[in-house]
Amino acid sequence: MGNSHTTASSTADDTTAAADPANLQEYNSVAIPPGGIITILSIDGGGIRGIIPGTIVAYLEEQLQALDGPDARVADYFDVIAGTSTGGLMTTMLAAPDKNKRPLYAGKDLVPFYKEHGPKIFPSAGIFETVRDTTRLLSGPKYDGKYLHQLLKNLLGDTRLGQTLTYVVIPTFDIKTFQPTIFNTCDDSPEKNAKLYDICIGTSAAPTYLPGHYFETTDANGTKVEYNLVDGGVAANNPTLVAISTVTQRMVTKDPKFLLDNTSKQPIGCHRFLILSIGTGTAKYGSKYTAKQAAGWGVLGWLSQGDGNPLIDVFSDASSDMVDYHIATIFQALNVGDNYLRIQEENLRGTASSVDISTKENLNALEQVGKNLLKKAVSKLNLFTGQYEPIEGAGTNQDALKRFAKLLSEERKRRITVSAAGGQ
């Protein structure tokens, strides 16, 4: 689930009190003044289970608003927001501009969005349709994706990646080139400045669930560049490491936004990363499948078992866990474990572990999972056992998010103060 944040507050400058909170909604720069920290929000893939991180994000934004006023939005505080699949959709909702150049959606709008549109994106099947759909998995996706496509087209229009209000990182996988394709605002190449609509459809195109997505852009020479995309979860269901890598690449290219200061030209070190990574839940302790069961599965068995898809479930959960393990290892080894908070529910049961069951009962249950997760103890990964253990004295995830919000607010006010003083 993650680590508490107790030490990073020392990065905030004593002059932050001089900043006027009333001006926060007018400040939307991603520039990091000297001495600052890099703030990253990462949201896993997981279909309809996006309601879980949606609940967490809503709570975080509520705490930011308590500190800085009702106009505060998540995108105002994070230098990078990364999301895969359903997380990519939420990333776009939080970072895409409306007509007033403010975030399209507030954190509190995420769960209602999923409750309204989830049943139409993943329509429930009757008994006879269920049998037919299981057989159809051998010849086509479970859902046609038409509602999702039209919804995102209406929502995002022609807005492009380069227009987001903060840096975003959205992984996809190109099945023609057979390699990950990462769309990020840091990438200056014209061919990557695609429409957010296309990127969201691509990162959400989960194999067997939704059709792959094809679209074209042009490079600097006007040459056509084509994309043949499926769900980013194939490559990076937990995009936290991709987000870190993206920032690191910009450091290597001496991007001034990610340098420690303008004099030394030194990159910002790992100790100045402040990361919130939110999962969509897993059935790790639910005994979802067994080797005895899997021993008898053929192609169809691996594609459909009860409410789940074992093949998708296995690689997406494994991908998320390995990323968490690597980051936790690095941050703990560098003695900056407090700068990384992972919030993840590991004990989903029954239909709650499905990525596409969108009945009213399950949607409400997933929201409750998110609310309960807020009340659970902050935990960190034991690198020797691989298990998550509560951190003594760290309180609940709710407490950790309050501390996190305070750090974000302090850093933002510090930036406003530095900016008002001419960047010195």
Language model segments and positions:
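Conserved catalytic cores and adjacent C-terminal regulatory segments
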Residues: 2-424
